[in-house]
Structure formats: structure tokens, C-alpha cells
Amino acid sequence: MQLRNLSNVSNIDLRSENEFKKGSIPQSVNIPILNNDQFKKVGIEYKKNGSDAAIALGHSLVKGSLKENLIHHWTEHLKKNPECLLYCFRGGMRSEIAVKWLNDCGVKVNRLKGGYKNFRNWVISQHLDIENYIKDWIIIGGLTGSGKTDFLRSFKESIDLEQIANHRGSAFGVRDGGQPTQSDFENILTLDYLNHKYEKLILEDESRTIGRAGLPGFWYQKMQSSKLIILEVDDDKRAENIYYEYVYDELNNGVNKDILLEKYLGSLNNIKRRLGNVVYNNIKDLMNSAFHQNEKEIHKEWILTLLTSYYDKMYSCLLYTSDAADE
């Protein structure tokens, strides 16, 4: 199986839970042969007494019903995903032993050569040269609230970077569930790009980082040198768009009003220094009034003040840094 096709099936990641949390092959399921505590003990034994002693300890830690339970879970997953691979960090002893145990039970399975480390090195290599990005890239830009994301999603040729990063790409852009690790962000983005079937790629204009997720390698430079199309929307419509996305939809989806207010006040406080005390206090007062009165027009007032006092000034410095811009 080619590395670019690995996310087409749900592979079995045999590494410990903590290793898996740091990054994995997309769509993988974590069924560790050694859990966190066991992996730590085996690692200490390896440093003290070498490979043979570590392997022996591993076998003593995973035997009997524990071993049988593992084999059962692996087998059940393989029944649903017969083309899946097993992998550990380097494609070494953990995956070798797991394959042997399954083979001994009459279950045939392959492991990923070189393991997760090989996959990660391959992902990184895809971004080491800007010439690797061979598609015709088109960037959708515009001031905050101009509807770039909705416009982007109307095209089948698009990749939604903010969706992958689970962040709206702004000071108020934090989403529930947290962001993926940097490794997971790069893994998902790389596979999405390499499996993108169209000659043109449409992306939303983004900063070098989306929340905590950094665009890999030369990706940002490629965006900066690509054709830029700017969406123009009047201020009232922009405030309306932001209201529905950040307030109405959130409350309509069951988010508690007080929790949402506290979240946005925290985001506002993070940019207090850039706003200055007068503007900060004005937005804060309007925001409190809007949430307490549940008044759309007051919401739009604090949103518009935030747009014109912060976001527009920030974006205007970045908007025309690409090589070509069309309105």
C-alpha cells in the first residue's frame, strides 16, 4: 500500500497511548501492545539490561488473558478492516510480535515497513521543496466576516485548512475539542493534499499559523505566491455573518450563554493591549449588554467595533503581500 493511501483504511497503531496522542496516521485506531506503564517499564529494562531482557519483560507483562484480549481486539478490527496494517514506531519488535501472535491464531496481517517514523519522515519530505506543490493554487482572501469559509466550501477543489486545524484562525477562533497536535495537523493536511484529485486547489487565505497549528514547510510561501481573489462585502453584512457564526449558531447548538460570553471575554482580554483601554472597555461593555439582553443589534455593534478596530487593520497589512490580487 502506498503511504498516501494509508488513511483510506483504519490501521492499527500498536504504540502506547501517549505516543499515539502525539501523532498518528489518520484514521488509525490505537490498540497498544504495551500500554503507557508497560512501555515505560520495558524502556527502563532495555536501558539497564539490553534488548533480550526488555523483550522478556514485555512478554511477562502481556500474557494470559491480557494477551488473549489484545488478540481478540486486533482480530475484531481486522474483520471490519481486512486491508489494514499494523504499525509501531519503527516497524520493530512490537509490530513483529503482534503479527506473530496473530499468525499463530491463523490471522494473516501485514505491518507497515519502517513504522510511524517512516510515515512521518515521508510527510515532512513532501514540504521540503516548494516545487513539490505542482497544482494551480487559488487563494480566497477578504476582510474578516466576508464569508470566505462558506465560499470556499462551495468548491469541490477546496481544502479547508481551518477545519483540519479545528480553529477559525482568529483570536476568537477557538473551537470545542481542541486542536490536533502539530504532527497530526501535518499528517492530515499532507494526505488530503496528495489525494486531492483536481488540477486546481482552492484555499482560504491564512496566516502562517492557524491557532497553534503551523503550516508545514513551504506551504505558506506557496500560498503567498499564488493567485489571490478578494471577496468584498459591506460592513453590516460582515457583522451579520459573524453574529450568526459566532453567536447565533453557537447558542442554537446548545452552548450555554454565560459560558460563551466568558469564552469571548477571555479572547477579548488576549488582545487588550492591541486594542487600547478605551476600545477594549467599549467592546467589553457592549458584549456584556448583548449577551445579557440577547439583543442581535447590540451584538452586531460590538462585532463591528472589533472588526474595524482590530481585524481590518491587521488584515490590511497582510492582504496584498501575495504576487497577484483580483477583486
Predicted regions and their residues:
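Conserved phosphate-donor/acceptor-positioning beta-strand/loop module used by diverse small-molecule
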Residues: Q224-I242
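Positively charged, proline/Ser/Thr-rich regional signature most characteristic
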Residues: N5-L78
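N-terminal pre-Walker A segment at the start of P-loop NTPase domains
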Residues: V109-S125
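Glycine-rich phosphate-binding P-loop
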Residues: I139-F155
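Catalytic cysteine-centered active loop of the rhodanese-like fold, especially the PTP/DSP P-loop
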Residues: G58-K113
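Conserved nucleotide-sensing/catalytic segment adjacent to the nucleotide-binding pocket
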Residues: Q163-P216
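An accessory alpha-helical subdomain
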Residues: L66, E245, N253-M314, L318
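Conserved small/polar residues in nucleotide/adenosyl-binding loops
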Residues: Y320-E327
